[in-house]
Amino acid sequence: MSESVRTNTSIWSKGMLSVIVAQFLSAFGDNALLFATLALLKAQFYPDWSQPVLQMVFVGAYILFAPFVGQIADSFAKGRVMMVANGLKLAGAAGICLGINPFVGYTLVGIGAAAYSPAKYGILGELTTGDKLVKANGMMEASTIAAILLGSVAGGVLADWHVIAALVACALAYAGAVAANLFIPKLVAARPGQSWRLSAMTRSFFSACVVLWRNGETRFSLVGTGLFWGAGVTLRFLLVLWVPVALGITDNATPTYLNAMVAVGIVVGAGAAAKLVTLETVSRCMPAGILIGVVVAIFSLQHALLPAYALLLLIGMLGGFFVVPLNALLQERGKKSVGAGNAIAVQNLGENSAMLLMLGLYSLAVLVGVPAVAIGIGFGVLFALAIAALWIWQRRQASY
């Protein structure tokens, strides 16, 4: 394929639109499947502590395959990598529909998601460049946010009607993503012929980890984003447990509506951060991180739906304002030291490790019988203290 086809394609080309459609359907399936499978666990009388374990097996796949998925994406045509990854997601969702253990099926979806992540971002730079690339990234993020909102709500609403119907809808979304991938042009592999020795691949990946960890700015960013996304995924599961206790509502849809408010808030907060924070003033985002924990603690004490919606919207806004500058800092500094792709891969490992740790602690708290409201208050206070400690540590590092 010619270089002109690879780099000067319009963002409205068939290939680019196919990527965006595939991303929307794949992300829709991911978010709908989570809530549909949680509803299945409830219907089959799994214990409450098993709910976060479901996400832990998904996250575990990300961690296990982190050293390898970047090279896989670069060694083959990325559109085909995306298609195979969505095929794995389809197989996992279909398996759950057909009665296999939901944890086994969800693990398969996690493996597909781990392989899909570096390919979906990497292909944008192969389909377009320059200002068009910025717009393409914007389209990708917009489709992802839309999929999170619609997928989360659809999963909960459909599960209230019929759990199997909700699971079938997820499988159909993944099938649509596979079909959309077929319309992506088969581009030349970015880095073919790399060594497939597992020891060499692992050493290369962890070498990048060491480089980023030794740099004060990138270490600060890795810890901050890890804490944020670990807290975010834990909050998702806390809402499922908290809603029946605090609000007396037992359906599957209400937690998804509340989660959607967080996503809307993140969009607003991210926009504010883009205007108010630069790489030189990243520390401006830290008070927002501390306030996230404070507001989570206040939210946990609510017993009415309207203030719950308002506080979750505020949590999302604070979250978007907090995490976007940290992401930008890591991408900019990481690009110069280990390359943008390696920086993102290391960040994914850090974020998913934090998710695994926080979900494990949350599962343990539920297992020993800590009330949902108490978990929420403790979670908020600990998060605020962790971000405050990170801020103090960063200021001391900067003064040396």
From Swiss-Prot:
Keyword tags: Cell inner membrane, Cell membrane, Lipid transport, Membrane, Transmembrane, Transmembrane helix, Transport
Transmembrane portions of the chain: 19-39, 53-73, 91-111, 139-159, 164-184, 195-213, 227-247, 257-277, 281-301, 304-324, 352-372, 373-393
One Gene Ontology molecular-function label: lysophospholipid:sodium symporter activity
Listed Gene3D superfamilies: MFS general substrate transporter like domains
Cellular component aspect of the GO annotation: plasma membrane
SUPFAM superfamilies, per the entry: MFS general substrate transporter
Domain of life: Bacteria
Subcellular location: Cell inner membrane
Its biological purpose: Catalyzes the facilitated diffusion of 2-acyl-glycero-3-phosphoethanolamine (2-acyl-GPE) into the cell.
Protein name: Lysophospholipid transporter LplT
Chain's gene name: lplT
